[in-house]
Amino acid sequence: MSAAELASSYAALILADEGLEITADKLQALISAAKVPEIEPIWTSLFAKALEGKDVKDLLLNVGSGGGAAPAAGGAAAGGAAAVLDAPAEEKAEEEKEESDDDMGFGLFD
């Protein structure tokens, strides 16, 4: 990541943290105040357009919401909820057993 991208990213995060609208002018003002040398205005306008109308805090909170986040959330759940979260994993294991390739006499080298 280049210095321009980093500076624009950090400036956008600062604006989002303060609850301000992310615009190219505000990004450029923050970057200038930080005395980052020679950032082309294209970077600030790209970041402003990319983040226009989006809640940056919400984006950051949902970064890990892919497939791996559910088990981590299940560990923090209270008593009865933990048992409910573990049930689908057990069903999945049973399905895999049913779909196993038992020797049916159709071997390649029989």
UniProtKB/Swiss-Prot annotation:
Keywords: Allergen, Phosphoprotein, Ribonucleoprotein, Ribosomal protein. GO terms for molecular function: protein kinase activator activity; ribonucleoprotein complex binding; structural constituent of ribosome. InterPro entries: P1/P2_N_sf, Ribosomal_P1/P2. It comes from the Eukaryota. Residues 85-110 are annotated as: Disordered. Pfam families: Ribosomal_60s. GO terms for biological process: cytoplasmic translation; translational elongation. One of its GO terms (cellular component) is cytosolic large ribosomal subunit. P1 and P2 exist as dimers at the large ribosomal subunit. Plays an important role in the elongation step of protein synthesis. Belongs to the eukaryotic ribosomal protein P1/P2 family. This is Large ribosomal subunit protein P1. The gene is CLAH12.
